[in-house]
Amino acid sequence: MPLDAGSIPAASTSFCSLNSALQPRALFFCTAAAHEGVRGISLRAISREEIAGLPVRRYEGDVLLVTTPAERDRAMADIRQERVAGFDTETRPAFVKGQSYLPCLAQVATARAVYLFRLERTDFSAELAEFLEAPGITKSGVAIADDLRQLKLLFAFDAKRVVDPGTIASRHGLSQTGLRNLAAIFLGFRIPKGNRTSNWAAQRLNPAQITYAATDAWACRELYLHFEHAGMLDTHRHG
């Protein structure tokens, strides 16, 4: 869930005295508390060692692997009522130079569940185009422009209200804009990388793959909500 500033030590607390797992997020709130608005916020980079010391978090809510018309309808009914959705895609890894593949999984995270659409198994182009074009739903995804570019090779759409948390962080002076760095800095937890290069085109996705995919989309939504709560969206224009 998005962090509550009330649970973070006050600005007068010594940063050096905090537990290492709290330092990234505490730095953000302590600095923010000393300035009016976010223009004075100073963000620092986070090291691999600091990330390794953070608690691991994975998505623990409902995940629906959409395969049937009934599951599709359930997913779209939930997505249509959402204000902010996390979004990500997964692609089969290529290990040969010059070889590439198109996305084979699209993940949409709402406040209630994460929905996984297997693009190689069923044609979800109409549903995903509806979602991506919906002007009332903010789509939050790290490096989402790359995901959309690849999806357009599968079907046509005109995406609206697209936001990249990495771009928001960059506009506030942060150079580390990958999902795992952002989750560590702003949300205070570590997302494992384990299944990033697994076979997303496999006949069946295993539980670890499903959790990995759901976690990425969920974290993208959590980052947007965190930035919104912290007032970091003021200078960001939705696409």
Model-derived features: where do they sit?
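Short hydrophobic transmembrane-like helices used for membrane targeting/insertion
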Residues: 1, 8, 38-41
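Short, positively charged low-complexity motifs
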Residues: 6, 20, 32-36
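Cationic, low-complexity basic patches in intrinsically disordered or flexible, solvent-exposed regions
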Residues: 24
